[in-house]
């Protein structure tokens, strides 16, 4: 068994710089050298293996096994989700159903800003709550590009929108995992996050529209933006504090969709933005002259929406713990990963006591969200009149379309698992933990870093939750506050994690432009994370914000 070493150079800053090499290599390759994503990911993976084996003294076979374990996880369940979401999109697009759906959304409003709120923010939050793990970005990115948004806008905006709901994604999985790894009360953690994120659920819709069309365009529709945000934030606070983490996103998303749709029946902006570039360039008409209508019958519209309604119902069903448990009971295959399972030991101060790391690959082929999406796709295909041979042809074309994306995701997860099991992630985390009185701010950024590295708020909570609790207790801070801050800060890192960026580029048919997407969203990510850090610092030290911590 190998024990992790967090300061192999006996100098925390040298060790931290070494630990940062894999991430810097991959992000620099993407953002500055315009190298294709799958090549950049492989470069990052090679550098991670070198740092782990040479710098952090991880056994070679263990490091390689960790990378293979991550690659397997990248393909299943994450790649499996993306493959089947795009399969459904291709099925609907070939039959002309997506065109009808697109125009029916324009029927609610022809304004691009309002379409963005409905799809990326409200509808996307529903998929985050029901499925998580890349589902919302894949679905909303595909829908936005189908509506005529530019690829960069569709990719970047779907990523920015997928922030506020992330902490309660997949029916509360990040909070449940955080409670498990810290030993803190799950309902207390749920409530604490619910006293941090609702403010950002109000801010993000404004931020989203501002990112698309600027301040002037955002202010012009502020009543609708406020309705979308408030209708999400209020249920988010109430459900998280008085019920638990399970239905926060689903309830808040449905509330936001319904309230915004009803509001748009009685309110119209003075000028309708119909241009796809987010500018008032003549592609706009007065609100009085444009109602956003279409020429399709109600039956045709319902037929076009049916595949996505089936998808919503099945993804929600697949997220219910009891249903998932029942499916796992007849299908789950657990594989103890050779040369890795119980071969690595996490050490203090990252863990309170030495802790042996498991590595069990769960092949939950029936209960996986991607399988639910596949079933929804097949049902929808039959309803649209596809024959089995036609379905198989579309599926093969979808696979060929996504082959490099799947390769990229596998390589990125291989990198992430290599840094996780080698302790490289934890070295970066400890650098944040050594910030003393500023720890509430930098501890929040630690959550942001965790999600940026792992691609998952759940994984970040598992990785750094124990460290947050231990550091908070040593500094005299409330451990519930800092554990919750890890999750709340983490949501802002979701838009820059390489896995999500590849999902977005794939969904918008813009693979190979990941560097441009990263540059587009990076400022938004770090700025929002800093704002969360400021709020957590106020909650730690400044009255009356301290009253929110109990």
Q: What does each of the following model-derived ranges do?
A:
Residues 237-333:
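Active-site loops and adjacent core secondary-structure elements that bind or stabilize anionic groups
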Residues 93-98, 110-111, 144-153, 180-187, ...:
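Juxtamembrane helix-boundary/capping and inter-helix hinge elements in multi-pass membrane proteins
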Residues 7-21, 74-78, 131-136, 188-202, ...:
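Structural signature of hydrophobic alpha-helical transmembrane segments
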Residues 65-73, 78-147, 385-471:
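Membrane-embedded alpha-helical segments and adjacent helix-loop junctions characteristic
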Residues 167, 171-279, 488-550:
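Juxtamembrane and boundary regions of transmembrane helices in multi-pass small-molecule transporters
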Residues 113-125, 151-164, 187-205, 211, ...:
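Alpha-helical transmembrane segments of multi-pass membrane proteins
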Residues 295-446:
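Transmembrane helical segments that form the transport core of multi-pass membrane transport proteins
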Residues 18-27, 37-56, 79-85, 225, ...:
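Hydrophobic mid-bilayer segments of alpha-helices in multi-pass membrane transport proteins
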